[in-house]
Amino acid sequence: FPWIPGMDFAGTVEAVGDGAEGFEAGDMVFGCTDGGAYAEYVEADPAQLVVKPMEFSYVDAAAAAYVSQTAWQALYRHGRLGKGQHVLIHGAAGAVGAFAVQFARYTEAEVYATAAGRDRDFVLSLGADVFIDYRTEDFAAVARDMDLVIDLVGGDTLARSYGVVRPGGRLVTLVGKAEEELARECGIEAVSMGVEPNARD
């Protein structure tokens, strides 16, 4: 202590430390750090920064940094999603899920998405091909032989998701513990992940 929370930020570079390259005072940037972002000034590694597009407000840029990077790493670094593959995204109406749906759609994957029925129009507008109301529908009866499942819900949803992944496919959970033995029995790869703040993703 004192400990300052917060990971997402956006602002103008005030000063550049010795040996730091790629940015200069006055640059408009945003990014994600390991903590300390809820402050007037943030110390960040240049590897955690990207230049803010002019069309983004600082508020929008800061709001997107952590959740978009989390979705990206889940889909591509851990999930290795490719064009034409089938992906099921649990919790698609949330912040990370909404980015995941859009990224997957951009990749030209077939996107299955679960959320509450009230969010149907929103999730479909993001690019989901198939919407599943988790309250009234059994996702396991709709989404079968998935190349990838992104779990943002955990609990029973995670436990039942192993059965909808095709042999050789992948399950990525951000909120639960991947069961390696169960994954082996199903012939799939399962991984638990947390976001790694960096500018590469």
Q: Which ranges hold each PLM region?
A:
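Terminal helix/beta-alpha structural elements that buttress the NAD(P)+-binding lobe
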Residues: 1-201
